[in-house]
């Protein structure tokens, strides 16, 4: 069985291209979203995405990749704290929409 973790992130091996680094970032953001949606309210994920985009991209003028990177850092921290506080999801998550009843809000754009 192969190890699903990436052993060398982009920027450390000296062999990758910028396109490979962006592809790695996209894959990692999608992976954290797939995991976060099982543990955090979808509305929270959507708001973090929207506010990250609004602040880092629109107000600060940062690139899309930088905005995704900052979003990734925030989501990693949120998921870490969720697990650190004692996740009781038991692998099943909180169901669609997180802890809030009703239909889930739309996912972050481009991160379905």
Swiss-Prot record:
The record's note on quaternary structure and interaction partners says: Interacts with the P6 region of unprocessed GAG. Interacts with host VPRBP/DCAF1, leading to change substrate specificity of the CUL4A-DDB1 E3 ligase complex. Interacts with host NUP153.
As annotated in the record, motif Nuclear localization signal runs over 65-72
Q: What is this protein called?
A: Protein Vpx
Function of the protein: Plays a role in nuclear translocation of the viral pre-integration complex (PIC), thus is required for the virus to infect non-dividing cells. Targets specific host proteins for degradation by the 26S proteasome. Acts by associating with the cellular CUL4A-DDB1 E3 ligase complex through direct interaction with host VPRPB/DCAF-1. This change in the E3 ligase substrate specificity results in the degradation of host SAMHD1. In turn, SAMHD1 depletion allows viral replication in host myeloid cells by preventing SAMHD1-mediated hydrolysis of intracellular dNTPs necessary for reverse transcription.
Keyword annotations of the record: AIDS, Host nucleus, Host-virus interaction, Inhibition of host innate immune response by virus, Viral immunoevasion, Virion
One Pfam short name? VPR
- State the superkingdom: Viruses
Q: Which Gene3D superfamilies match?
A: 1.20.5.4730
**A GO cellular component entry from the record:** virion component
Compartments in which it is found:
Virion; Host nucleus
Q: Which portions of the sequence form the region Binds to human NUP153?
A: 61-80
Per the UniProt entry, what are the Gene Ontology biological process annotations, in alphabetical order? symbiont-mediated suppression of host innate immune response; viral life cycle
Its lineage opens with: Viruses, Riboviria, Pararnavirae, Artverviricota, Revtraviricetes
InterPro entries, per the entry = Lentiviral_Vpx_assoc_factor, RetroV_VpR/X
Organism the protein comes from: Human immunodeficiency virus type 2 subtype A (isolate CAM2)
What family does this belong to? Belongs to the lentivirus VPX protein family.
């Amino acid at each position: 069985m192969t190890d699903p973790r990436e052993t060398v992130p982009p920027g450390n091996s000296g062999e990758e291209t910028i396109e490979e680094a962006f592809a790695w970032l996209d894959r990692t953001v999608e992976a954290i979203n797939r995991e976060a949606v099982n543990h955090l309210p979808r509305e929270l994920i959507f708001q973090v995405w929207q506010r990250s985009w609004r602040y880092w991209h629109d107000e600060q003028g940062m690139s899309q990749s930088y905005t995704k990177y900052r979003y990734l850092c925030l989501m990693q921290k949120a998921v870490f704290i969720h697990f650190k506080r004692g996740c009781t999801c038991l692998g099943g998550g909180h169901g669609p929409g997180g802890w809030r009843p009703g239909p889930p809000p739309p996912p972050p754009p481009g991160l379905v």
